[in-house]
Amino acid sequence: MSRETAVVVGVTGAFGEVIAKRLLWRGLDVVGVARDAAKLEEVAGRLGQEFIPCAADIGDDGAIAAIASALPDQAVAMVVHSVGLPVAGGILVAEPGALAAATNLKCGGFVRLVRAVDTRLRDKSRLVAIGGHYGFEPSPYAATAGVGNAALANLVRQMSWAYGPRKITAHLVAPGPADTDRLRKVAAARAERAGKPLDEEYENMRADSAIGAFTTPDQVAWAIAMLLDPEADALAGSTMGLDSGRRHGI
């Protein structure tokens, strides 16, 4: 059986390396994309020769050619858009331009990624974007995550309809809040506004879960790897909510 490729954008982030490791375990070669070439080489040293580093800024159109040129001469089974956003604060203090920047990274970046691999996609290839809880449950403390991830949910549905005739499926994975450095920055903004200690606010956020837990990177990687199964066709265009029981809406 010939080898195939997965492309993971944001591979040096909180989720990216864990996802890449899981996809390598599933037998795929992985092209890992990030801006920082030095950090990419560190990841490559940990993941081995089936990991192919690609230094590119997914917020810029030049990433399309950079990713395309890094692809091995084989089919692309999956792309994963796992780009993180800088914390810009709540909606009362965030710079207006930060909202546009978030949309460029989340939505523009996903479009660039898919266009880079379009000619290598095959039947049942998976186009996966990582959104987040705040795209569905708005918080005044997470302006960029809320706006960027809400827009991404719409884009994934558009991708689903656009690529469906080719039997290629698009998926949104919406974790969180996840136990990462970024979440601590969100908690710090909430704590400052509420006049509470950071640790107290962090535990309050944990208690928002029905099971008193934050989502972990390993759980996100598990869900994404599951989408490689042929049965995942049934999830075309849908959102996998990995929020550890936080959502209240029906």
Task: Give residue spans per PLM region.
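Conserved glycine-rich cofactor-binding loop
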Residues: 12-13
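Rossmann-fold cofactor-recognition segment
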Residues: 47-62
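Amphipathic alpha-helical dimer-interface segment in Rossmann-like NAD(P)H-dependent oxidoreductases
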Residues: 69-73, 104-125, 160-161, 229
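Short, small/polar-rich loop/turn modules that mediate ligand/substrate recognition or access, typified
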Residues: 164, 169, 235-237
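Short C-terminal tail/terminal secondary-structure segment
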Residues: 231-250
